[in-house]
Amino acid sequence: MLTVDYDRLGLEPGDRLLDLGCGAGRHAFEALRRGARVVAFDYDEGELKDVAGMTAAMASEGQVPAAGGSACVRGDATRLPYPDASFDRIIAAEVLEHIPADDAAIAELSRVLRPGGTMAVTVPAWLAERVCWALSDEYHAPAVPGGHVRIYRESGLRSQMRSAGLQPRGSHHAHGIHSPYWWLKCTVGPTNDDNPLVRAYHSVLVWDIAGTRPWSHLTRLADRVLSPVIGKSIVVYARKPHSTVTPSAVTARPTVTGEANAS
């Protein structure tokens, strides 16, 4: 299940791509299949271990083009361990809403993106997220450690990106059929996965993600119709202009552990 449109991002074989807050690796895997040199970056060691295992398996099965490669790196999004202009493309999918100092994270992303490079930032869309917060205090911080700490409006996110020296260049909503699922979960309890309605709806989402026919045709049609209205995520694409003056680099760097599975 991808949130970012790689064609709009402009990803090409051999591009250096940072997947910030890579999580389970969905965007990193697709970028690797397209021949990018991917850094999957996250704070969660367990998820990074799983991502490293998957990328190694992809390489051994011949799913990685010659131009591609990957590394898994643990670190702090507000103190990235890379020189200025290290990456051609950046994806930050569903991560900024977890970071208290999101301006610092956006500034770091701008710093490590090369002039002329592009970035895709995705966060929960305002309407879908507002309903979730209204339905359940268990859905967000402080009730959930590491949970969502804010709700974004697209205009505010664009303003933050401009302040970091980036030029927003377009946006779209995604995952329209996922919003009702999360509203249902928030109604019965975000951790109540045994609820019959939640389990039934989850099966529908699995059909959609797996492309199970004929149901996936219906779910994907529904998603295209619903996403502009109640999409769970908003994606904003931006470019770093050649003349930009990026925020000063953070001088201190975290201790970072990395695992490269291809080069």
Annotate each predicted stretch with a short phrase.
Residues 38, 119-120:
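A short hydrophobic/small-residue beta-strand
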Residues 103-118:
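A short glycine-rich, Lys/Arg-flanked "PGG" loop and its adjoining helix->strand segment in the class I
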Residues 120-148:
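Conserved class I S-adenosyl-L-methionine
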